[in-house]
A protein has these predicted regions:
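N-terminal extracellular ligand-recognition/capping segment immediately after the signal peptide
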Residues: 229-238, 246-263
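Sec-type signal peptide cleavage vicinity
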Residues: 1-225
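Short active-site loop/helix that positions an aromatic residue
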Residues: 241
Length: 263
């Protein structure tokens, strides 16, 4: 996740992918499991490096289907984030500088990110969505020869990312951190919905340029729910005779008005 100083804090659900190369320059992808350091900027991960292979680089977050061909890494920016708990999952890369000592890996961001805090969330809300002018999810490639590798969406493209969470009357505020590819965006729209037919707010940002490791911080938004009667609903109510006076008064009603003052 991300703290108030916009530094990445590790979580106990995090995992890394360690890519190792053999004598034939074929790569393996080994999962490194979280061990300690939740809530800190540094954490410890454990795993086993394949025998006879050399550690080359590490990727966050771990994805089982990540692969390397030549100098190109292929991974995914998911269009759907289920059971979202506020994690950023922003993709990062760390080059191994000493294959014999993996005790300190320094990660670099490979994308940008949008941060948005939503307050006064309705109890029925279950979905946060980002809709962009560019492709923001799908299969991505990374040029590993670059000094600062970045993700580029290349196939199975989507212009939407949806983060779903469990509806709750107790949670009134949520932070959303959604990774976005670098680039120039004519529009980026955020929505909070109930997952089907109700949109609680829509916020659109125009003409944004996002570079590697940029965080687009949107001022906090409050959800406001307004109940209104539509003309059709009013007509239906008036058509029901029970909503109208049933009979006129039998006696005339006289109202006296006294006016005083200088005229």
């Amino acid at each position: 996740t991300v703290n108030d100083e916009y530094k990445i804090l590790w979580q106990d659900t995090d995992a890394l992918g360690l890519f190792c190369s053999n004598a034939e320059s074929n790569y393996s992808n080994t999962k490194l499991e979280y061990a300690s350091g939740a809530g800190q900027t540094s954490a410890t991960f454990n795993g086993s490096k394949p025998s006879g292979e050399t550690a080359v680089f590490s990727i966050y977050p771990y994805q089982q289907n990540m692969s390397v061909s030549g100098n190109t890494l292929t991974m995914t920016l998911p269009a759907t984030l289920t059971n979202y708990n506020g994690s950023s999952n922003g993709p990062m890369y760390a080059k191994v500088t000493n294959p014999d000592n993996l005790s300190a890996l320094s990660f670099k961001h490979m994308a940008a990110m949008i941060k948005l805090t939503v307050n006064k969330i309705p109890a029925e809300a279950t979905t946060f969505k980002i809709i962009a002018s560019n492709n923001i999810a799908g299969t991505c490639t990374v040029d590993l020869t670059a000094a600062d590798p970045i993700l580029a969406v290349t196939s199975d493209e989507s212009k939407e990312i949806t983060a779903s969470f469990t509806a709750s009357a107790d949670i009134k505020s949520r932070n959303f951190y959604i990774p976005l590819p670098t680039g120039t965006y004519s529009s980026i729209t955020a929505q909070l919905t109930n997952g089907s037919d109700k949109v609680y707010f829509t916020k659109t940002l125009n003409d944004k340029i996002l570079g590697r490791r940029d965080i687009l911080v949107v001022p906090p938004l409050d959800c406001v729910v307004v109940e209104a009667t539509t003309p059709s609903a009013l007509s239906t109510a008036l058509a029901d005779s029970k909503n109208l006076p049933q009979e006129a008064p039998t006696a005339a009603t006289v109202t006296d008005i006294a006016v005083s003052g200088s005229f």
